[in-house]
């Protein structure tokens, strides 16, 4: 009996120790206000910042590798860190931005009837051999063998896999069509020369959708539906985009369009008609052609970053894998297909490329990792008394503006001046920065509010701050 009591006391002591440890971790990660929720503090963020140019170069290896603004800025502020050529660690801020982008994509895909699935990254070689793409893709396809000698590839795309999946459902009815299946997963491509950070890597996130329809007419209607969803997506992100006619490439099909962001470092050459907005990749239109095929107006040339691609596949894949549906007369017919890609991490990097200044990151408002950064006074300064005032403002924001919970950072590095912390906040591109300076000691207190996207700086009372932040939309 005594031994049992001893063991019980030991277990109780261990449990108490574990509880104290958990409380310690929570205390270290957050500041907790009396009677309030937890404050998210910047000092606990795993975010290497303010890397010097030589440090950034040492991460990527060669000065020639740092040829675009988004790559340089994302490395400098610690949004990404290289793991190997073409592969990057995505740091917490970046993961938050990617997750927000995926939420926006989910909203648009599900608004048109998309159903989200998840297919394996490992794809059997026999699927790719059936379409001849095992050889056609060449060295870009990352291949491997398991211990039994079976060959696989790390999928750069999933036309074969999804068509085989749908073909396995023997009782697919016309009533289930159109069928729109999509996923957001890691993709792999053995790029011969990875460059531009997340713009051209060997491992990346991609949204790929595959559609199945009962006729060519219905499939082309679905094609237009998905293209319209892409247009809405880029409009919501506040990005200027072009929909350009494009080559079908190794994916195949009979019609293809690229969604491009115009930018000087873009690797795609495009021709554009300013009159009717016709645009095409030069892969399908000879540069010597100076006249628009639609309106006969003059064509101009520009460069772009491809962030989306759509294909009308017809029955190229469904005929190989026998993906059938039963029509209203009980007949088995081949499904008409389309496939649609969005480069998730590429969209993020391309948005930073086109929106940022040379020294400071600017995000699409919806994708900013955190919407607000609150900067208290420096410890020991004349404004120290305003610390409690601005911390109470932080807590009041959490209570009064529920959509911003988890979206507001308190920069508690009070050993630094306000100016140094404002400089960091400006580099990271929080849409709003709230500063407690000397005017926070006035009655009523006034806070300096920076709107990073517009460059506007205003002084607002607590009520004014609340009114401003209430209008912030978060996904």
Curated annotation (Swiss-Prot):
Instruction: Mention any one GO cellular component term assigned to this protein in its UniProt record.
Output: mitochondrion
Q: Where is the transit peptide?
A: 1-29
Q: What is its EC number?
A: 6.1.1.15
Query: What's this protein's function?
Result: Mitochondrial aminoacyl-tRNA synthetase that catalyzes the specific attachment of the proline amino acid (aa) to the homologous transfer RNA (tRNA), further participating in protein synthesis. The reaction occurs in a two steps: proline is first activated by ATP to form Pro-AMP and then transferred to the acceptor end of tRNA(Pro).
Instruction: Give the gene symbol.
Output: Pars2
- Keywords of this entry: Aminoacyl-tRNA synthetase, ATP-binding, Ligase, Mitochondrion, Nucleotide-binding, Protein biosynthesis, Transit peptide
Native organism is Mus musculus (Mouse)
What is this protein identified as?
Probable proline--tRNA ligase, mitochondrial
Give the signal peptide range: none
């Amino acid at each position: 009996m005594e031994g049992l009591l001893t063991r019980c006391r030991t277990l109780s002591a261990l449990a108490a120790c574990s509880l104290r440890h958990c409380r310690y971790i929570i205390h270290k990660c957050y500041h907790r206000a009396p009677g309030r929720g937890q404050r998210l503090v910047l000092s606990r963020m795993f975010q290497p910042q303010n890397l010097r140019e030589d440090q950034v170069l040492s991460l990527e290896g060669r000065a020639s590798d740092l040829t675009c603004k988004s790559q340089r800025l994302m490395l400098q502020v610690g949004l990404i860190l290289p793991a190997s050529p073409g592969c990057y660690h995505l740091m917490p801020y970046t993961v938050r931005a990617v997750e927000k982008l995926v939420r926006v994509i989910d909203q648009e895909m599900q608004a048109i009837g998309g159903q989200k699935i998840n297919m394996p990254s490992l794809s059997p070689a026999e699927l790719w051999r059936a379409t001849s793409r095992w050889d056609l893709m060449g060295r870009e396809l990352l291949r491997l063998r398991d211990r039994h000698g079976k060959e696989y590839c790390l999928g750069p795309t999933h036309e074969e896999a999804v068509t085989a999946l749908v073909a396995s459902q023997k009782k697919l009815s016309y009533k289930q069509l159109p069928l729109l299946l999509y996923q957001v997963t890691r993709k792999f491509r053995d790029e011969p020369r990875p460059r531009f950070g997340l713009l051209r890597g060997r491992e990346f996130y991609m949204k790929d959708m595959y559609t199945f329809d009962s006729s060519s007419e219905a499939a082309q209607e679905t094609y237009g539906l998905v293209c319209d969803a892409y247009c809405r997506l880029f409009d919501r992100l506040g990005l200027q985009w072009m929909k350009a006619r494009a080559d079908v490439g190794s994916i195949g099909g009979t019609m293809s369009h690229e969604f491009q962001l115009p930018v000087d470092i873009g690797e795609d050459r495009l021709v554009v008609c300013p009159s009717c907005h016709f645009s095409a990749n030069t892969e399908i239109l000879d540069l010597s052609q100076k006249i628009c095929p639609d309106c006969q107006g003059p064509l101009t040339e520009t460069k772009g970053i491809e962030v989306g691609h759509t294909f009308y596949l017809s029955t190229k894949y469904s005929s190989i894998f026998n993906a059938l549906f039963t029509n209203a007369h009980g007949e088995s017919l081949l499904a008409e297909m389309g496939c649609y890609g969005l480069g998730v991490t590429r969209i993020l990097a391309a948005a930073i490329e086109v929106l940022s200044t040379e020294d400071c990151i600017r995000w699409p408002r919806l994708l900013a990792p955190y919407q607000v950064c609150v900067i208290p006074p420096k410890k020991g300064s004349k404004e120290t008394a305003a610390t409690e005032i601005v911390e109470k403002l932080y807590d009041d924001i959490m209570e009064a503006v529920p959509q911003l919970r988890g979206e507001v950072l308190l920069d508690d590095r009070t050993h630094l001046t306000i100016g140094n912390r404002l400089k960091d906040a400006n580099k990271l591109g929080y849409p709003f920065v709230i500063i407690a300076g000397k005017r926070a000691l006035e009655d009523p207190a006034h806070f300096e509010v920076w709107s990073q996207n517009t460059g506007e700086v205003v002084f607002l009372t607590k009520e004014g701050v609340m009114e401003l932040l209430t209008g912030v939309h978060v996904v």
